[in-house]
Amino acid sequence: VSRLDASGLFYTDLFSREEGLVSLLLVANPYSYKTMIDGMDRLVLAVFRQAPDRETEHWMWCETRILVLRVTVEQLERSLAGDDSPGLVQWLAHGDILLDSDGYLRALKERLETWGANLKERKLLCEFSQFAKTYLQSKQDLKDGQILDAYSHILASLHHWAHIALIEEGMHPELTVWVQMRNVNPGIYKLYEELTTNQETVEQRVQLVILACEFSVFTKMKSSCTLLLRLIGTRTEGWTVSELMHHPELEGLKLDLSLLLQKLAKKGYLREIAKPHREIGLGILELRYASAIERAE
């Protein structure tokens, strides 16, 4: 590897010519994180204010394969909150900042370490949404006699539950999540072992984990949905699902908002307010969601 590559000067020189560049990150020695950069030798993450013309490129230089990712600040923020890119936290933790014109990446890394700017609440909400959805799908699969599908979905549900437990402890989930869980939450780790290695039938194993997930969905609901409950509580007249979907705090997050609202309402954490909606049709009522504490006007 040349000195230019090792020092990052090669990449700095190339990308500094691109208009609107905010920050530049190089992951030069991926080691165990190589699978997170699609088997390439280097990852260059270039952050822009405006959407770039080319988002993903593969380069080769001196036998070194380079994955180039161009993202906007907004895309990066959404990915971090919604965990769309599981390797992103590791990239930021292990990468070298080559350019950072306004200190954005350094501030972002600090935010990750301190869980600032509602990051913890947003990640908990996203993980809980997926936790509840996959658990319910597994439960339905079991009713339909689709045992292997039920197994697949409850395994995914366990992963989201594990992520919730880690985030609650102030830890970022890694790809080796079960190594983390062995120390952080032996109970969830034991369920994972029961599901994957127990000698009982697949159906019996799935039933066992579904019962545990069902209890956890109800006990984790309020604390995991703090962000959503707080936003809804800012209006006495309530919110439509469309208004919530486009709220700046929620827009772009990977959420099954309809499922969350219904579960929260049935549990009594929210109220449904049915109001006539003449634009839709006579007799049609539009549902709005308000805090369970406030009274409707």
Give residue ranges: language-model regions:
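General structural signal for secondary-structure boundaries
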Residues: V1-A6, T72-Q75, G116-A117, E200-R205, ...
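Conserved NTP/Mg2+-binding pocket subregion across the NTase superfamily
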Residues: R3-D5, C62-D144
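Conserved nucleotidyltransferase catalytic core and NTase-mimicking acidic/glycine-rich helix/loop elements
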Residues: R122-E272, E294-E297
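Charged, low-complexity, helix/coiled-coil-prone segments
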Residues: V27-M36, V68-S79, W91-L105, I167-L175, ...
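Short charge-dense sequence patches
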Residues: M40, E57-H58, L76-V89, S101-T114, ...
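Short, amphipathic alpha-helical interaction segments positioned at domain boundaries
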Residues: G281-E297
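Metal-dependent nucleotidyltransferase catalytic core
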Residues: V1-H94
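Short Lys/Arg-enriched helix C-cap and helix-to-coil transition segments
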Residues: I273-H277
